[in-house]
């Protein structure tokens, strides 16, 4: 049976930063080993529990009836932006650098494409989320329908977006972009290999580490928010019968229908 282990380089790094079993090493193990696994467990079990016992709550709680103009502007920006961001993260984290080099994609070309598309997607997500939050705060009926969970979700979501976009933009503006595929990506993969190597994540700049921590907290909160609708798709619509709308059949007989009131003489 495969067991969870912290690799040798991680132990050496922890000793270097905290001195064996000191407070710093304990904090590093909590942040970069315990927190990811706790977040993943809550994410998986929480979604199962939510679907099993709260199917009627598995919804976006749409507020389109209350206001449509801002929603038509902010919602597409946010959803298309966050989709591109998610695909970019999946590709950048799960696909190792050795694979892209083997298929002929140079580091310069990969970095240019990742930064350009990532920045565009990030700003679309940020602008869309800002519009949706502004709408939720300023439109009375929408604000009244906003729950405490919604507010926590928006705080965590915006923190994760801002930290991620900030590390990307600031790193390139200063002329010192950081290649996260050398540290953050292999650390993330090591978590799923059940051999978390904290030495890798500790080499990353503080901005990347804060972004990662914010993401883990968001994932842990995900099952208890309206974000569960990400895993819903109206597949039943493809096979269900058409809904046919018909006007009322004309009344049979030659007698004209009587009115429901009589004139007072």
Indicate residue ranges for each PLM-predicted region:
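Long, contiguous internal "core" modules enriched in hydrophobic/ aromatic residues
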Residues: 62-76, 82-83, 87-191, 202-206, ...
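Short, strongly hydrophobic alpha-helical membrane anchors
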Residues: 1-30
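Membrane-water interface of transmembrane alpha-helices
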Residues: 43-55, 125-136
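A short, charged helix-loop
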Residues: 197-198
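N-terminal membrane topogenic signal
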Residues: 27-34, 69-73
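Alpha-helical transmembrane segments of multi-pass membrane proteins
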Residues: 40-53, 84-93
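Alpha-helical transmembrane segments
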Residues: 36-40, 78
């Amino acid at each position: 049976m495969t067991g969870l282990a912290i690799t040798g380089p991680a132990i050496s790094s922890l000793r270097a930063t905290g001195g064996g079993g000191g407070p710093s090493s304990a904090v590093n193990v909590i942040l970069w080993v315990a927190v990811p696994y706790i977040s993943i467990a809550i994410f998986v079990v929480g979604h199962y529990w939510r679907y099993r016992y709260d199917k009627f709550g598995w919804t976006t709680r749409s507020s389109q009836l209350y206001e449509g103009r801002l929603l038509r502007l902010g919602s597409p920006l946010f959803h298309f932006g966050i989709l591109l961001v998610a695909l970019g993260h999946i590709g950048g984290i799960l696909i190792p650098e050795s694979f892209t080099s083997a298929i002929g994609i140079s580091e310069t070309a990969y970095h240019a494409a990742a930064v350009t598309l990532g920045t565009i997607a990030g700003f679309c997500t940020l602008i869309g989320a800002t519009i949706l939050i502004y709408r939720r705060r300023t439109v009375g009926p929408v604000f009244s329908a906003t729950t405490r969970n919604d507010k926590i979700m928006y705080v965590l979501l915006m923190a994760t977006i801002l930290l991620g976009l900030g590390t990307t933009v600031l790193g390139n503006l200063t002329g010192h972009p950081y290649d996260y595929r050398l540290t953050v990506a292999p650390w993330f993969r090591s978590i799923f290999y059940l051999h978390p190597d904290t030495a890798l994540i500790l080499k990353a700049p503080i901005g990347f580490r804060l972004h990662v921590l914010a993401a883990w907290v968001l994932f842990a909160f995900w099952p208890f928010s309206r974000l569960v609708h990400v895993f819903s798709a109206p597949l039943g619509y493809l096979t269900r019968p058409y809904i046919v709308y018909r006007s009322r059949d004309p009344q049979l007989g030659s007698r004209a229908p009587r009115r429901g009131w009589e004139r007072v003489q």
